C-alpha cells in the first residue's frame, strides 16, 4: 500500500432509498444495529480507512433522520441531495466531487453494508488503481442458480461458474464514472450499479473477490446476521 499512500479517495454513499422490503417504520439505513444506526456504522468504518478523506452521503431532501445523527456533524461528511434512483444519487455526489476537485478516484458504497472489512478496501485499491479504469468487490455464486418462467416454474439451470454477486465498494475514476452515469441516464438505460454504467460504455471493470460477510441488509433477518458480523469484527480488532 505504500506506493499508493499519497492518494486520497472520496466515497459516495447513496442513501435516499426507503428499503420497503424491510417492512420497518423507517428506511433500513436508520435501523439500530449494535447500539448505532446502520448508516453510522457504515460511514464510521469508511472514515477509519486511511485513504478515505471525505464521505459524501446522498440523502432525500425530506429525510428527517440524518441530521439528528452525531456523524452528521463530522466535517469529513458531506450531505448532497439524493435522487429518485441510485444512479441519480451517485451522480449528485460526483458533481460535488468535480466541483470541489476532491479526488481523482471515487468509491461508491451501499449505506446498508456496515460489515465491510478494511482488508477488502485495500485489496480493491491495490487491484484497481494501477489499471487506471476501475473495478468492484464481488463474491462468487455458491448456490445452484435456476432461471424461472413467469409462473415460477424452472426454465433452466444456469452455469454458476461464470456468475458473481456484485458487492460494494465499487471504485472508478471520477471523470469516467461521471461520464458513464450521465450518459446512461440520458439514454434511459437500466443502471443497477456503477459498474453497469461503465459496462454500457464498452469497458470491462475488474472483479476483485471480496468477503461474503460484506452483506447488504435487505431483509429483516439480515439485521441479526449483520450484528453478529459487526461484533466479530470488533472482537478481532481488540485482540
Swiss-Prot record:
Site entry: Positions MEP for the nucleophilic attack: 160, 216
Protein keywords: Isoprene biosynthesis, Nucleotidyltransferase, Transferase
Domain of life: Bacteria
Pathway field: Isoprenoid biosynthesis; isopentenyl diphosphate biosynthesis via DXP pathway; isopentenyl diphosphate from 1-deoxy-D-xylulose 5-phosphate: step 2/6
CDD domains per record: CDP-ME_synthetase
Biological process (GO), any one: isopentenyl diphosphate biosynthetic process, methylerythritol 4-phosphate pathway
Pfam family, one: IspD
InterPro entries hit by this protein: IspD (IPR001228), IspD/TarI (IPR034683), IspD/TarI_cytidylyltransf_bact (IPR050088), ISPD_synthase_CS (IPR018294), Nucleotide-diphossugar_trans (IPR029044)
EC number: 2.7.7.60
Reactions catalysed according to its record: 2-C-methyl-D-erythritol 4-phosphate + CTP + H(+) = 4-CDP-2-C-methyl-D-erythritol + diphosphate
Site description Transition state stabilizer, residues in chain: 21, 28
A molecular function GO annotation: 2-C-methyl-D-erythritol 4-phosphate cytidylyltransferase activity
Entry similarity comment: Belongs to the IspD/TarI cytidylyltransferase family. IspD subfamily.
Function: Catalyzes the formation of 4-diphosphocytidyl-2-C-methyl-D-erythritol from CTP and 2-C-methyl-D-erythritol 4-phosphate (MEP).
NCBIfam families: ispD (TIGR00453)
Protein name (database record): 2-C-methyl-D-erythritol 4-phosphate cytidylyltransferase
Native species: Aliivibrio salmonicida (strain LFI1238)
Gene: ispD
Amino acid at each position: 500500500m505504500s506506493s499508493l499512500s499519497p492518494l486520497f479517495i472520496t466515497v459516495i454513499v447513496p442513501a435516499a432509498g426507503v428499503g420497503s422490503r424491510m417492512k420497518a417504520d423507517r428506511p433500513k439505513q436508520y435501523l439500530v444495529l449494535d447500539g448505532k444506526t446502520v448508516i453510522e456504522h457504515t460511514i464510521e468504518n469508511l472514515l477509519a480507512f486511511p485513504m478515505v478523506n471525505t464521505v459524501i452521503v446522498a440523502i432525500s431532501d425530506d429525510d428527517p433522520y440524518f441530521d439528528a445523527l452525531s456523524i452528521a456533524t463530522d466535517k469529513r461528511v458531506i450531505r448532497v441531495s439524493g435522487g429518485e434512483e441510485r444512479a441519480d444519487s451517485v451522480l449528485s455526489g460526483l458533481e460535488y466531487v468535480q466541483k470541489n476537485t476532491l479526488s481523482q478516484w471515487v468509491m461508491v458504497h451501499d449505506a446498508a453494508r456496515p460489515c465491510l472489512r478494511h482488508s477488502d478496501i485495500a485489496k480493491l485499491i491495490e487491484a484497481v488503481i494501477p489499471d487506471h479504469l476501475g473495478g468492484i468487490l464481488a463474491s462468487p455464486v455458491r448456490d445452484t442458480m435456476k432461471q424461472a418462467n413467469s409462473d415460477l416454474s424452472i426454465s433452466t439451470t444456469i452455469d454458476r461458474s461464470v456468475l458473481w454477486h456484485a458487492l460494494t465498494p465499487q471504485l472508478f475514476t471520477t471523470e469516467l464514472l461521471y461520464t458513464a452515469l450521465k450518459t446512461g441516464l440520458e439514454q434511459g438505460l437500466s443502471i443497477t450499479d456503477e459498474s453497469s454504467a461503465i459496462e454500457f460504455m464498452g469497458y470491462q471493470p475488474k472483479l476483485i473477490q471480496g468477503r461474503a460477510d460484506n452483506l447488504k441488509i435487505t431483509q429483516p433477518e439480515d439485521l441479526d446476521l449483520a450484528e453478529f458480523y459487526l461484533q466479530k469484527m470488533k472482537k478481532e480488532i481488540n485482540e
